[in-house]
C-alpha cells in the first residue's frame, strides 16, 4: 500500500471545528429535551398530589 497524501492543517482544523459544532448543537438539543421531560414530569407529579 502506498501512503496517502497528507491533508493540510487548515483542512483538518475545519473538519474538527465542524464536528465540534455539530456535537455542541446536539448536546444543547439533548439538554433542552431533558429539561422539558423533567418539567413535564414535575407538573404531572404536582397535579396528582
From Swiss-Prot:
Pfam annotation, one family: Ribosomal_L32p
GO cellular component: chloroplast; large ribosomal subunit
Gene Ontology MF: a single term: structural constituent of ribosome
Domain of life: Eukaryota
SS bonds (residue pairs): none
Ranges where the record places region Disordered: 1-23
GO biological process: translation
Record's keyword terms, sorted: Chloroplast, Plastid, Ribonucleoprotein, Ribosomal protein
Protein localization: Plastid, Chloroplast
Family: Belongs to the bacterial ribosomal protein bL32 family.
Name of the featured protein: Large ribosomal subunit protein bL32c
Native source organism of the sequence: Oltmannsiellopsis viridis (Marine flagellate)
Amino acid at each position: 500500500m502506498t501512503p496517502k497524501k497528507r491533508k493540510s492543517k487548515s483542512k483538518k482544523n475545519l473538519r474538527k471545528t465542524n464536528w465540534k459544532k455539530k456535537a455542541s448543537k446536539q448536546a444543547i438539543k439533548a439538554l433542552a429535551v431533558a429539561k422539558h421531560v423533567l418539567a413535564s414530569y414535575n407538573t404531572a407529579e404536582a397535579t396528582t398530589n
